[in-house]
């Protein structure tokens, strides 16, 4: 039988608290690796007994070789008039994930080869990545892309892609039995509520509740990691 949360006095307050955490983490630029992931886990660790683990890039984990670490300082496109038409400072969705560094000037046709839009909605900025192929790009709305005039465009992506670490966090609570309950969520997607932030907020809330209990029948591991 489904739980009627409206009958639980504390539910509304808990919901507001978790929503507040999502608002804090929404602007943090996250990806598979990097300082955005570290900042996110550090914030969650203020509320729960989170253990943060860093594994060197290039490490073989089952069938996966851990990718290089990626960090971005700034990324933008300036139009012919010098105004910025796309800027990751406005939204972390604007930059193609794992874009390589670039500092160049291109014409509109060339820029168009590096722009990603959503054909289903003229006002939506899509989320796109290029983890396994070295390229660069920007994501914007189709309406903005189609309104760009002819001319020269300055493109700058100040990013690093190299040796570093893959960072994840976990909360492990001992149990009376040997079997383990694993609860996991992704931590790598930026500025996405359904796909990422809701899972992190929910696990943070669960970790606080479970950590406050004295006994657990099974070991419980709550993991925040890229999958």
Feature-to-residue mapping (PLM):
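N-terminal hydrophobic/helix-forming segments and targeting peptides
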Residues: 1-225
